[in-house]
């Protein structure tokens, strides 16, 4: 599953490609993708909207849709009759395991697993592909976005003021879960998945199986800094992420930091710091990697 850095790279690529474009029409080939909305309602709400922006909240992609001074197309209810008002919606997308966007020309062949197609006013298509069909799309009024399911309970953004050292200390002190399990909880620490949690714990020199509440203040400080450092480096332009929206064969995420991995998927290899062999254990249904010497405590 793409983690925060990979989603950020996708957001940047989408922003360059589609901001300012108008959605002429849309087509849904996988009805469950947009539940509980029906296909006709979903398509009607998107028709003639302009893509005003693309941003991220945690691992969610937020595509902001504007309708200028007109209401979204459709039958007007009684309160909506009269002067036109400004309306805006947000298309909330979670890629889950295999979701990806492609930005195609009219001549490009239809890609496999293309479950949502957005026809734009420049004769291009924005196609959402998802081989495993776990991805999710939903339309939310911008004024209600902060209260939307999946968004409302997210932890603070890691680069915002709210994700402070004090916040992390308080969060860890209240939990009897292991550090690795807690770091994967998006309602406690945002944006980390299996890869970056393992890398942050290694940089901090902390055992992933340690109970969160037992971590010393000094180690919490090291972990806080390690989380920020790992995410910043993976998001930076020098990372190895490749997001080519125009070529499905060149589309690659989940590798934004691969050449810098120090423990993840390195079981049995020598630790880059001490030479000990990296270990792996199944924990919480996922593989956890760590150095038994550098991360003893």
Task: Please provide the spans of the model-predicted regions.
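Basic, nucleic-acid-binding surfaces and adjacent catalytic neighborhoods in DNA/RNA-processing proteins
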Residues: 22-42, 55, 167-297
């Amino acid at each position: 599953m793409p983690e925060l850095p990979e989603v950020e790279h996708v957001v940047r690529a989408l922003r360059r490609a589609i901001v300012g474009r108008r959605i002429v029409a849309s087509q849904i080939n996988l009805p469950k993708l947009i539940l509980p909305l029906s296909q006709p309602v979903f398509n009607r709400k998107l028709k003639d909207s302009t893509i005003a922006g693309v941003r991220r909240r945690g691992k969610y992609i937020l595509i902001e849709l504007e309708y200028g001074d007109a209401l979204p197309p459709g039958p007007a209810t009684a309160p909506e009759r009269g002067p036109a008002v400004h309306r805006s919606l947000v298309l909330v997308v979670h890629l889950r395991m295999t979701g990806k966007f492609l930005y195609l020309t009219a001549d490009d062949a239809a890609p496999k697993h293309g479950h949502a197609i957005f026809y734009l006013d420049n004769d291009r298509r924005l196609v959402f592909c998802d081989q495993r069909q776990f991805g999710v799309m939903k339309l939310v009024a911008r004024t209600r976005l902060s209260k939307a399911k999946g968004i409302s309970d997210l932890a603070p953004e890691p680069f915002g003021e709210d994700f402070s050292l004090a916040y992390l200390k308080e969060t860890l002190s209240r939990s009897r879960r292991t550090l690795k399990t807690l770091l994967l909880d998006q309602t406690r620490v945002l944006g980390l998945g299996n890869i970056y949690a393992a890398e942050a714990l290694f940089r901090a020199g902390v055992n992933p199986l340690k109970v969160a509440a037992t971590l010393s203040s000094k180690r919490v400080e090291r972990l806080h800094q390690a989380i920020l450092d790992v995410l910043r480096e993976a998001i930076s332009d020098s990372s190895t992420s490749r997001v080519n929206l125009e070529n499905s064969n060149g589309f690659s995420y989940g590798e934004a930091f691969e050449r810098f991995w120090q423990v993840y998927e390195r079981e049995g290899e020598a630790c880059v710091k001490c030479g000990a062999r990296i270990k792996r254990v199944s924990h919480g249904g996922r593989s956890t990697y760590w150095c038994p010497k550098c991360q003893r405590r």
